[in-house]
Amino acid sequence: MKMKKYVSHRFLQLIPILLGITFLSFAMMRLAGSDVVTEMYQNRGTEVSQEIIDAKRAELGLDQPFLIQYGRWLGGMLTGDMGESYMTGKPVFPTFLSKLPATLLLTALSIILTILVSIPFGILAAVTHDKIPDLILRFFSFIGNALPNFFVAMLLMQLLSIRLQLLPVISDGVTLKSAWMPALTLAVSMSAKYMRQVRAAVLEEWNKDYVQGAWARGVRSRVILWKNVMKSSMLTIITLLALSIGNLLGGTAIIESIFMWDGVGKLAVDAITMRDYPVIQAYVVWMAIIYVLVNLITDLLYHRLDPRIRLGVTKG
């Protein structure tokens, strides 16, 4: 099977997955049992008659059978029309797009910080196995894994914002300076987890027969590490990065709320609180697309890096 055929086949597989996710999420929200129109007016602090509520429900199509509602929404989504927010009355798609720059900036900065910390220290812990550097790094990795993100956020606020006054506590807009605090908070836990995984992957490769054979032939340790061990360990690192990128692009609701970072995660939390179904549905679609694409890209990277997988594709 050629690579183009493989990619086309994977894309075709994604269509029923996305349709299934949108259908289930749409059904679950409709089965919640609450009257969206009544809550919408209550949240706005407006008292209206039952006639107005019924008219609004008909305007939004909420008086139609479930399948008709889903079909109308799906048809609109395919043309870029995700409806209007029940709470603000603004189009959902532009509102969602306006939050993406903040989420993309936070994702990129968090991933960069995580890579810069976890990979070098993970390698150092592996090559100094059971020695003092390894023990120290494993201790800090354990602490980083144990601390919840909101607690790390409070510690960083106290240290970097209140005492040292280096960074702002609350975001004053989508700027690089405001992104440092939430990005550092996310990077602490991710770096701790990644460092352990990188260490384990490097140690596993380091103890394999081909590495021992290279040692016996007099190949230098540095060459073995970077040319052989790290190349084989990249699959583990790519898997971890793919999962984290998916989570980060979906927004990190707690961290965004703590630092008032105006990203996708905060938008989703506000929508869930207000039962703003069109915005919630847009968020579900976004998350589904992100995870599907991230998994596809990860598979393609696997084929690129692992000759055994690539061989299986070409012969399939």
Please state what every model-predicted region is:
Residues 18-71, 165-181:
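Hydrophobic alpha-helical transmembrane segments of membrane transport/permease proteins
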Residues 4, 96, 100-133, 174-316:
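Alpha-helical transmembrane segments of integral membrane proteins
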Residues 62-119:
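An internal, D/E-rich "acidic patch" concept
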Residues 138-200:
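Membrane-water interface segments at transmembrane-helix boundaries in multipass membrane proteins
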Residues 3, 11, 52, 56, ...:
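Hydrophobic alpha-helical segments of integral membrane proteins
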Residues 14, 99, 103, 139-142, ...:
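Residue-level signal for discrete positions within transmembrane alpha-helices
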Residues 32, 144-147, 249:
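Transmembrane helix irregularities
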